[in-house]
Each structure stands twice: as C-alpha cells, then as structure tokens.
A protein has these predicted regions:
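N-terminal glycine-rich FAD/FM-binding segment characteristic of electron-transfer flavoproteins
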Residues: 1-273
Length: 273
C-alpha cells in the first residue's frame, strides 16, 4: 500500500506574530510541520507497519509545497519514518486552498497512491478546505475529522470514526480515498491495519519523535524537488487575502469583593441583567 501525506509548514504557533500595515511580519519566524499533518504522518506510519516498531510494509510518501528551505520540515518527517519526500518548490504565501488542491491532484496522478491522509486543517489559516476540494476534484470518497481508522485486511476499504456534536459517527469508506485527521487519531488504538497488526496492538498516545537512527537514515532517503510547472498546473488563486489585523485590545478584568458587587456591576455597567 502506498499512502500519500500532504504536509504544510506553518509558523510556530507558540510564538506571537507581529501584524503591521495589514500584513504579518514573518521575518525571523521559526517554521514547523503543521501539527495536524504530523498526526496524519503518524497515522500513515501505523497503517504500514506490523505493530509498534514493526517491519514496514508499504510506502509512506510526504509532499509539501513551499520554498526550498521547506526541505527541513520534510527531512524531519523522513526521520519520523516516511519513505520518500516530494517538495513542490514555490512561494507558499501565494497559495489558496483551490490551488493547493490542484497541485496535489497532479501529484496524486503521478504517484497513484492507494490512500491520501492529511491534517484536518492548517493551524495558520484554519481553512479546512484542501482535503475536501481534492476529493471532489478526484471524484474520490472522503472522510474528514477522523478520530480512528481501521483498514480492512484486503486493503479495499476502511472503517473510520469521527466525533460530531451528537456523539461518534462510524462510516465505511472504499479506497482510494481522501482522509483528514483530528487530534484523537494518535490514540493508542486509533489506527490499525487488520492485515498487519493484531487487535491487541498499541502505539504511544502521541506522534513519534525522530530518533538518532531515524535522523541518520533520513539522510539516505529520497527528497525530490519538482516545480508547479513540471506538474502541468496552470491558473492562479481564487481567494485573495486582503489584510491581516491583530485582535483589538480589551480592557483588563476587575476583581470584585462580593456577589452583591458583581451583580451591581453586571446591572449598572455591563447592563446584562
């Protein structure tokens, strides 16, 4: 089985970005793999190995669109255990969800994966669109916001669960398909391939970290750089971001000494009661 995992580099979400003159100042920003895409890589690795730390059966290919230094994030994913990496070189600030999906559709056509798994959304834009657009353009089934994946022994379908407002929804999806994953996908028993791992198989309750052995092995793995033009993708973006603005400053909270004082402030100042 071949699994393709599209991944995006994002600014470190723990750092405060500077917003000025309608744009975000990314000078000096540190970049990392979008956390939800890391979860997708972990899910793909579990689906292609014989239990925790077991032999890999199949191939996990990661792909990212961005400038040349995005190779640093791809090398991290190779060190995690991915077999190959593809960098579609280009300006990742000049993309929208539709163009990303068109580029990925061309990559899918070239790679012919059995399954595409990606994060439910990127933490910088929070658009939650690429997986759905890609599935629609390919005419493939899609399963989004997944909390678990159980791949059938014949590799032709998967039973998946997703958390919804009313509880947990279970579906069966035929392959090839597009899947987007949520945080719970890295649970101990959230992902399993019936053909490779027994029902008792468990993994760590988190995504794996790159080991020294993995880092050394990554140096010998293929990281291929291609261009958007070589994929035959034409046309520009459909959605343009006009400006970014920082949230307006809020007044500091106040402490009250009693319930009576709180009620008085809610009535006289906030005027909500």
């Amino acid at each position: 089985m071949k699994i393709l995992v599209p991944c995006k580099r994002v600014p470190n979400p723990d750092l405060k970005l500077k917003v000025a003159n309608g744009s975000v100042d990314l000078a000096g920003t540190t970049w990392q793999v979008n956390p939800f895409d890391e979860y997708a890589v972990e899910a793909a690795l579990r689906l292609t190995e014989k239990g925790k730390g077991g032999e890999r059966v199949g191939e996990v290919v990661v792909v990212s669109i961005g400038p040349k230094d995005t190779s640093a994030q791809l090398k991290q994913l190779l060190a995690m255990g991915a077999n190959r990496a593809i960098l579609v070189a280009g300006d990742d600030s000049a993309l929208d969800s539709d163009l990303v999906a068109r580029i990925l559709r061309a990559v899918v056509a070239a790679e012919k994966p059995d399954l595409v798994i990606t994060g439910k959304q990127a933490v910088d834009g929070d658009d939650n669109q690429v997986g759905q657009i890609l599935a629609a353009s390919l005419g493939w089934p899609q399963a989004t916001f997944l909390a678990s994946i159980l791949l059938a022994a014949d590799g032709k379908s998967a039973t998946v669960t997703r958390e919804v407002d009313a509880g947990v929804e279970e579906r069966r999806v035929r392959l090839p398909a597009i899947m987007t994953v949520d945080l719970r996908i890295i649970g101990k028993k959230a992902v399993r391939n019936e053909a490779l791992a027994p029902a008792t198989a468990e993994w760590e309750d988190t995504q794996r970290l790159a080991s020294l052995k993995g880092i050394m092995a990554a140096k010998k793995k293929e990281l291929r750089e291609i261009t958007v033009e070589s994929l035959g993708v034409t046309g520009g973006i459909l959605v343009k971001t006009l400006r970014h603005e920082a949230p307006p400053a809020r007044k500091a909270g106040v402490k009250v000494a009693s319930v009576e004082e709180l009620v008085a402030k809610l009535h006289n100042e906030a005027k909500v009661i």
